[in-house]
Swiss-Prot record:
GO terms for cellular component: plasma membrane. The chain crosses the membrane at residues 2-22, 31-51, 93-113, 162-182, 208-228, 256-276, 287-307, 309-329, 337-357. The keyword Transmembrane helix applies. This is Amylovoran biosynthesis protein AmsC. It comes from Erwinia amylovora. One of its GO terms (biological process) is polysaccharide biosynthetic process. Disulfide bonds: none annotated. Keywords: Cell membrane, Exopolysaccharide synthesis, Membrane, Transmembrane, Transmembrane helix, Virulence.
Length: 375
């Protein structure tokens, strides 16, 4: 597991330079250096996830086996006949078909998916984050490990979902439409991203994000599964998929006041009180929507504490806004030592959580035999 710490801490070193130059960020030389470090980090993450081998991600064997069979079956019976056999979403199946036109090697397929997922997240950070290296560092310590190193369909779904939210706030509606289609057709959880849409039409309220997450606590104590599972059927595909987990080994509970939930509540409260201490200005709308999305994720996670496979999956879709939120928060603080301490602390927390305290996504790390140059 040490390799994950090395990767994230390596990016963290570059973050110190970005934070130190926060007041000179608009200068050409500073931009060039930061972009150069950013590209190195993105390339490293793509390769790190793309060349992984056995005993890395928990779900890897599922996708390696899938592509091994799929790439050979399509050559004999055609795409449509084979696609009907599998339960995977349309866009993911199309990606598998495109990859199968060039190779039958499953580990090349993982590299292909890694390139798309990491590049999409990188595009979002490059376009919308004020501190791109800091966002990339947080992503590498948590979302990258949880999603792109394991749940690759959900990783694609989440990357497209955050791109959808950002594009919608920027009023790039055609791009937003493209991203929501790609998200829902990468993983059925993507349909839940529509929960953010009503908040585009509701007047900004300073404490609304905090109200959302606090209101979810009594629902979580009662149990979201008991209250809402039957209603999930109104969501295409997702309701059926969620119901299929009920009563299985995936149907587990998590504490309402667990470490992750308490961290989310504390972050929402602290962010609200500090970032919006003078109220929500017109230029704060983008950050406000990101915080609303984060609050929805935290609230869903708490509400469905009695059905953690659903609460965790849907919650994590919205919690994908965290690397952007932290970047905006540090930009407003503008204190080098405090910012670096915050970034170091949250990066360390996530690395410890994902590799030691709750290693649910990864088993370790190895390089696939296909990519072992020196063995």
């Amino acid at each position: 597991m040490a390799i994950y710490w090395i990767v994230s801490y390596s990016i963290l070193v570059f973050c110190f330079f970005e934070l130190a130059m926060i007041n000179q960020a608009s200068e050409a030389k500073t931009k060039i250096l930061i972009n150069y470090f950013f590209l190195i980090g993105v390339f490293a993450l793509i390769l790190f996830a793309g060349i992984r081998g056995p005993d890395s991600g928990m779900d890897d064997s599922q996708y390696v086996g899938f592509f091994h069979d799929f790439s050979r079956q399509t050559g004999m019976t055609g795409y449509q006949a084979v696609a009907n056999i599998y339960r995977y979403e349309n866009f993911f199946m199309v990606l598998a078909w495109v990859a199968s036109c060039f190779t039958h090697e499953s580990y090349f397929f993982l590299l292909f998916i890694s390139f798309i997922a990491v590049s999409t997240n990188a595009w979002v950070y490059k376009k919308y984050s004020p501190l791109i290296l800091c966002s990339l560092c947080l992503y590498s310590a948590h979302l990258f490990i949880n999603k792109d190193m394991n749940q690759i369909r959900f990783g694609l779904c989440s990357a497209f979902a955050i791109a959808f939210i950002c594009s919608l706030v920027a009023r790039n509606y055609l791009l937003a439409l493209l991203f929501i289609v790609l998200s829902t057709q990468s993983h059925s959880t993507g349909y839940t991203i529509v929960m953010i849409i009503p908040f585009f039409f509701i007047r900004e309220r300073k404490y609304l994000p905090l109200v959302l997450v606090i209101a979810s606590i009594p629902l979580g104590i009662i149990g979201g599964k008991k209250l809402f599972l039957d209603s999930l059927g109104i969501v295409p595909v997702l309701g059926e998929r969620a119901a299929s987990y009920s009563g299985t080994n995936f149907d587990t509970t998590s504490p309402v006041f667990g470490l992750a939930n308490l961290k989310n509540i504390a972050f929402i409260g602290a962010f609200t009180l500090y970032y919006f201490r003078k109220g929500i200005m017109k230029e704060d709308r983008f950050v406000y929507i990101l915080l609303i999305a984060y609050s929805i994720g935290a609230a869903v996670r708490i509400t469905f504490s009695d059905f953690s496979i659903f609460g965790g999956r849907v919650g994590n879709l919205f919690l994908h806004t965290e690397p952007l939120l932290f970047a905006f928060l540090m930009l407003r603080i503008r204190n080098l030592l405090l910012n670096f301490f915050m970034l170091f602390s949250i990066t360390t927390y996530y690395l410890a959580y994902n590799t030691i305290l709750s290693a649910q996504s990864i088993m370790g790390y190895s390089v696939a035999p296909l990519f072992r140059i020196f063995s």
